[in-house]
From Swiss-Prot:
Database matches in SUPFAM superfamilies: Anticodon-binding domain of a subclass of class I aminoacyl-tRNA synthetases (SSF47323), Arginyl-tRNA synthetase (ArgRS), N-terminal 'additional' domain (SSF55190), Nucleotidylyl transferase (SSF52374)
Enzyme kind, highest EC tier: ligase
Residues making up the signal peptide according to the UniProt record: none
An annotated GO cellular component: cytoplasm
Gene3D superfamilies: Arginyl tRNA synthetase N-terminal domain, HUPs, Isoleucyl-tRNA Synthetase, Domain 1
The UniProt record lists the keyword Hydrolase: no
Protein name: Arginine--tRNA ligase
EC number(s) stated in the UniProt entry for this protein: 6.1.1.19
Keyword Acyltransferase among record annotations: no
One Gene Ontology term of the molecular function aspect: ATP binding
'HIGH' region, short sequence motif: residues: 108-118
NCBIfam families: argS (TIGR00456)
Originating gene: argS
Length: 563
């Protein structure tokens, strides 16, 4: 387009065609570019085509309607790409990305059990992280745990009160009971509250006893959390913890610098940054507190420090934060102050990957029957119970060991896929029946689609090595459509990496399973008398199997060979 006179800002808007009669891909940006140039769109489209050299890729290029360019891919080129992809460990996808990306996700609180509210951040973040790494990025996981604040003064003071300093022997459920009791004392006993506040000061000033107790609380919590991460097949480890305490020593200097720059001003004893970009109810610039009048700091101050640290110390090109949509304004304000203060350059990408809420069938936030918060471990236990019942009914031919593997894969996979398959920015309804169904866009359906293709090779006398030199021949439209869909895997994961939207990959995998099903129905494989066609179709099946497995792995969902 540029060679035809369009400016460098013009986008060809090449998209997959919605209907086969419009080709495989369609360039939709011609009319907008022609309008800017004051040219006839169809004439401009013709000029663009003359500048293109797609002779090896497209068998036909045509102009449609007022100026769309339709591309029909060449089947020999498609066959060649399939052959390259099926023999490649990365399915033909080149590792072209070399950015350093910090991903801040999961972020539970210390001295509390993980609950369903942590599920979305944990699994959405992990799917995006896996995808970024697959594409060649260096990813630094940052588990921004809540490991600082007044609650630690309360806990240490209460543990001391009940003469139980052996925190390392406690289960986290005990810690939660301690937390509730400590909070009751804090609210009702002024002497206890004063002691708790003193312990916070001691902790912040590095008191050895307080630091030791604090470290015990953190370690117990993270051991319990690691058990949840392992069950969820999430890649976070204790090495990825970058809690609030990491940034605490930086906060005084940041506030001092904001004051020196004239960004933070005193207001009733607190220090506030006023932002013209945000207005309060009176239409005046909104004030964002960075230091309270008692000298304490806020989450905003910590998030400014985190952004600065991720750029200066971790040398990142991009920082992603996976948290609730309700934190959107907070993140925007923290990052706006970060940029105004000059802590990061414009080239440093700060991206809030926000998500909606998990709702019950009643449309309200997901709770226990008694209205309490659902613990993540309890949710996963229930998933295993329900999957056990389902698999016992359906998989009678499996050994006990095989059955156990299927149950775990289906149970955890169902919970994760039900979430990941929804656009993260929307709320979604948590429904056991839907997520454990073998029909529709669900984990069991996708896992079963994978095992069905595995079974083809179990029945075949040919293995992957036997097929390595066999050519791919696309002799009919079903084969051709499957080949195109297989090569669109890279497009799907590029979107996930850029936008942080795993549902795009889920949709792609579900569509791929559907296209394969149609291919399998109309194109005999194992009983085909033409050996070349048989081998070619086996290669298409093999690449489909590999793509489903790799795609589900990027989502953190396990596959099994038998179901």
């Amino acid at each position: 387009m540029i060679a035809s006179g369009a400016d460098t800002q013009s986008d060809a808007l090449v998209r997959q065609s919605a209907k086969v009669q419009f080709g495989d891909y369609q360039a939709n940006g011609i009319m907008a570019a022609a309008k800017k140039l004051g040219r006839n769109p169809r004439e401009f489209a013709q000029q663009v085509i003359e500048q293109l050299d797609l002779s090896e890729i497209a068998e036909k290029i045509e102009i449609a309607g007022p100026g769309f360019i339709n591309l029909f891919l060449d089947k020999n080129w498609l066959a060649e790409q399939i052959s390259l992809a099926v023999n490649d460990d990365k399915l033909g996808i080149q590792a072209t990305e070399t950015q350093t990306v910090v991903a801040d996700y999961s972020s539970p609180n210390v001295a509390k059990e993980m609950h369903v509210g942590h599920l979305r951040s944990t699994i959405i973040g992990d799917a995006v992280v896996r995808t970024l790494e697959f594409l060649g990025n260096k990813v630094i996981r940052a588990n921004h745990v809540g490991d600082w604040g007044t609650q630690f003064g309360m806990l240490i003071a209460y543990l001391e009160k009940v003469e139980n300093e052996s925190a390392s022997e406690m289960e986290l459920s005990d810690l939660e009971a301690f937390y509730r009791a400590a909070k009751e004392h804090y609210d009702s006993d002024p002497v206890f509250a004063e002691k708790a506040r003193n312990y916070v000061v001691k902790l912040q000033s590095g008191d050895e006893y307080c630091r030791t107790m604090w470290k015990k609380l953190v370690d117990i919590t993270m051991q319990q959390n690691q058990h949840n991460y392992d069950r969820l097949n999430v890649t976070l480890t204790e090495k990825d913890v970058m809690g609030e305490s990491l940034y605490n020593p930086m906060l005084s200097d940041i506030v001092a610098d904001l004051k020196q720059q004239g960004l933070a001003v005193e207001d009733e004893g607190a220090f506030v940054v006023y932002l013209d970009e945000f207005k309060n109810k009176e239409g005046e610039p909104m004030g964002v507190i960075v230091q309270k009048k008692d000298g304490g700091f806020l989450y905003t101050t910590t998030d400014i420090a985190a952004a600065k640290y991720r750029y200066e110390t971790l040398k990142a090109d991009r920082a992603l934060v996976f948290s609730d949509t309700r934190q959107s304004q907070h993140m925007q304000q923290a990052w706006l102050i970060t940029r105004k203060a000059g802590y990061v350059p414009d080239s440093f990408q700060l991206e809030h990957k926000n998500f909606g809420m998990m709702l019950g069938k009643d449309g309200k936030p997901f709770k226990t029957r008694t209205g309490g918060t659902v613990k993540l471990a309890d949710l996963l236990d229930e998933a295993v119970e329900r999957a056990t019942q389902l698999i016992q009914e359906k998989s009678t031919a499996l050994s006990a060991q095989e059955k156990a593997a299927v149950i775990e894969a289906v149970a955890i996979g169902s919970v994760k896929y039900a979430d990941l398959s929804k656009n993260r920015t929307t709320d979604y309804v948590f429904d056991w029946d839907n997520m454990l169904s073998f029909e529709g866009n669900t984990a069991p359906y996708m896992q079963y689609a994978y095992t069905r293709i595995r079974s083809i090779f179990n029945r075949s006398e040919l293995n992957e090595q036997d097929l390595s030199e066999s050519p791919v021949v696309l002799s009919n439209e079903k084969e051709r459509l499957l080949a195109i869909k297989l090569l669109q895997f890279e497009e799907a994961i590029q979107i996930v990496a850029k936008e942080g939207t795993p549902h795009v990959l889920c949709t792609y995998l579900y569509e791929l399973a559907g296209v394969f099903s149609s291919f399998y129905e109309h194109c005999p494989i194992l009983n085909n008398e033409d050996e070349q066609i048989k081998r070619s179709r086996l290669k298409l099946a093999l690449l489909t199997e590999k793509t489903l497995k790799q795609g589900l792995d990027l989502l953190g969902i396990k596959t099994v060979d038998k179901m």
